[in-house]
Amino acid sequence: MNIVSWKDANDEVAGGATTRREREVKEDQEETEVRATSGKTVIKKQPTSISSSSSSWMKSKDPRIVRVSRAFGGKDRHSKVCTLRGLRDRRVRLSVPTAIQLYDLQERLGVDQPSKAVDWLLDAAKEEIDELPPLPISPENFSIFNHHQSFLNLGQRPGQDPTQLGFKINGCVQKSTTTSREENDREKGENDVVYTNNHHVGSYGTYHNLEHHHHHHQHLSLQADYHSHQLHSLVPFPSQILVCPMTTSPTTTTIQSLFPSSSSAGSGTMETLDPRQMVSHFQMPLMGNSSSSSSQNISTLYSLLHGSSSNNGGRDIDNRMSSVQFNRTNSTTTANMSRHLGSERCTSRGSDHHM
């Protein structure tokens, strides 16, 4: 008889029996659960490993609260705040009569937290607190206090009335609560603006340099705007300068207006203009003609402008405009003379051709 094979067979049978028993036990447990819940399926969740203390720390969003690990003497339910003397516990243990008086005062004031009653006491003793000597700041705690002083503005100021924050005293709220709260917010905003300005400037030299750079940049921007406006007022548009078509003589040019009417009417005082600049601007609509005609037109305009500037001394631009303007009679006379000269030239050329 083989003992090894018999042992293996018994192990397999024993293993099958144990698996069957485990299944039966599980089925019995499910039946009892279904009967206990009256036919409703219940899903059991595994308990979370996160403790209530850690969840409370996650809910805390105040940056002024400092959490200290157990290695440095901290506790799970205790949090610390940064003061001039270092980190201090937020919770303070009171004696029995002091705690009773504090809770009685809380009930009489009608506030929901004991800390608000303490705030009321601090505000009531404001004058006595101001008479006390200030606390000296140690060098090792100065850096910590300077780091957290931006977060201290989020809380209540030392001389602030609890009634200004909307607390109910004896079950009623005063009418001046809203106005005083708005005034406090406005003053707080002004203080924050002053603090940020002082923080970013740093020193008087830096502030002076920034101010000088700002004025210099502003002066450059104003100068650039003035030059662009001056160029815009000097450059004539095609609708403002009308050039007649060239018939026989290239110098027969009629100018309706040389300057925009809006520039003289809009600006009360206009500076004197250089005739050379005006001639250079008048070359723009005349670039399509020949070089001889453009040079003659430019010379004619320059002579007119130069004569008007020499007679008037360049004092008033209205006189210059009136001297440049042509009347309709003069333009028609010039056109007739040009046509007459053109006809004479044509007849003389015809006679020479016949000869």
From Swiss-Prot:
Pfam families assigned to the protein according to its UniProt record, in alphabetical order: TCP
Write the record's keywords in alphabetical order, separated by commas: Chloroplast, Developmental protein, DNA-binding, Nucleus, Plastid, Transcription, Transcription regulation
Its recorded name reads Transcription factor TCP13
Assembly, per entry = Interacts with AHL27 and AHL29. Interacts with SPL. Interacts with KIN10; KIN11 and FLZ3.
Key word Repressor present in the record? Answer: no
Cellular compartment(s): Nucleus; Plastid, Chloroplast
**Expression sites (tissue/organ):** Expressed in cotyledons, particularly in the vascular region, in leaves, buds, flowers and immature siliques, and, to a lower extent, in roots.
Q: Name one GO molecular function term.
A: DNA binding
**Major subcellular site:** nucleus
